[in-house]
Amino acid sequence: ETYDWLGKLDPTRLVVDNSACETPTTPNFHVATDLADFHVYFLAPDNAIRWRNQIADFAKRARWMWSPHGDTVESGDEPLILSEFGSWGLPRLDRLIADTGHEPWWFTTGRHYYRPSGIQRRFAASGLDRIWPTIDDLAEATQWHQFESMQYEIGQLRRHDSITGYVVTELTDAYWEANGLLDPMRGPKAYHDRLPALLSPDAIHADLRQRDFYGGDDLTAEVSLAGYGPPSTGGEVRWSLEVGGAVALEGRLGIDAWPEQGTIALDSLTIPIPQVDAVADAHLRLTATEADGRVRASDELRLAILPATARRTAAPLRVAIHDPLDIWGIGVRLSEMGHEIVDADSADLIVASELTDAIVNRMDAGGRALILVRSRGAIPENHDLARRVGIHLRRLAHSGWPGQRSPWEGDWVSSWSWILPKEFAGLPERNPLDFAYEAVLPDHVLLGHDPERHRQEVTAGMFVGWVHTPAALIWEFLQGRGSVTLTTFRVAPES
């Protein structure tokens, strides 16, 4: 009734009955509307697959956008608009305090993990200065993480010809809500110079299923071209793969005709990854031009390349496996890496998918164990470990935040994962962890550590929002005369 009333009041305007979104407690939908819009929030790269799948569903005019009660009035041609999405990139503190010399008044607003006050103290107490020299270095790193998340999400939106528009949340940070393209002072974020290409009416997109490679692998990508400019016959996409700052390979894809309004698929792209001697940064660059050479769209994706020799260990161990359900294929994976699978009495290391009393006893007697925490039951609640370790599924609500999602989920208030570079010299140095780590980013976090007292024990972790709720992703500590390493990284079988 309100939709009809407002449409008659001003027939020149589009009317949206309810800008719909899915929430944990109050799912909502459209009944009658001129725009079929929806809000979707997923953290990328952590939940990139969930984003990809939901956007693909949305592009098909999914029924979950509409009332399930049989009372909808649909024409079937309401434009599909993703009217809210985005992620966080913290502002530089030096810019916020430049005029007054102290924290802004709104730092004491916001609740829990989105309350800014005390961020510098938490930064120091969490040991994050081992990764980023200053809080402003951390802030800029989260901004680049925000950009790569938006780049992926916008790329997925523009792959689908049926989706006619999107609205990034938001133009500027709104006080503590740090998902703006600009900071609260209307200043640029670190990626500002990349925004024209990202938000251009014309866009070139390479859809990669992975961004981490070994030398000798093949990079494959589905390439699409979106256009909302003047018609043009012909053109090409020029691509190059740069490794360590130098062009290693380059080539071209033909464009028969530019789309005038929408998206077309081009030929797929296959690029052989060159061999490297050490882990290397790489960039895939694409430029789409008209036949006369005028550039209309460009894009750049950051990749990581590891030496082919890194597939196998340089220090093989005798490893005992405890994986009762054999879900993760741990033994096969370790054998492929060059380790010898033996019984527990002969092992240098026990690798297990769950902790048992027998494993604890072996560690107490001097043994070492690696526990791959892939479920909440991997460590029994009554365990006899030297640290009181808790496991939490990131997508599951937590009792400490009643009525809210788990803070570590990261879909609305971003969570960021990190590793200590000096502890993992053979891995890409990407903090916060980016798409090079997508396949192993964890579903669970480890709780119970004290960031100050246990700082040297935690070599990978996660924080949320304004540097709150620290959690461990790799936690190693002494157990009796031996030691245990716990990790929630999904190191088998996906990777």
Specify the residue positions occupied by each region the protein language model found.
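Substrate-binding/catalytic cleft of secreted carbohydrate-active enzymes
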Residues: E1-D173, E177-R186
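Aromatic-rich peripheral "rim/lid" segments of glycoside hydrolase catalytic domains that contact
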Residues: L9, S149, I154, H160, ...
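Short, solvent-exposed loop/turn segments at secondary-structure junctions
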Residues: E22, F42-L43, G86-G89, T172-Y175, ...
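Extracellular ligand-binding/catalytic regions of CAZymes and related secreted enzymes
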Residues: G180-L182, R186, V237, A297, ...
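Beta-strand-rich binding/interaction modules
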Residues: D218-A257, L266-T270, V279-E290, G331
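Extended acidic/polar, glycine-enriched regions
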Residues: S268-R311
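Helical hinge/lid and interdomain linker segments adjacent to catalytic or ligand-binding clefts
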Residues: A315-I391, T487-F489, E494
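A glycine-rich, often tryptophan-bearing local segment used as a flexible ligand/cofactor-contacting loop or short
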Residues: E354-L447
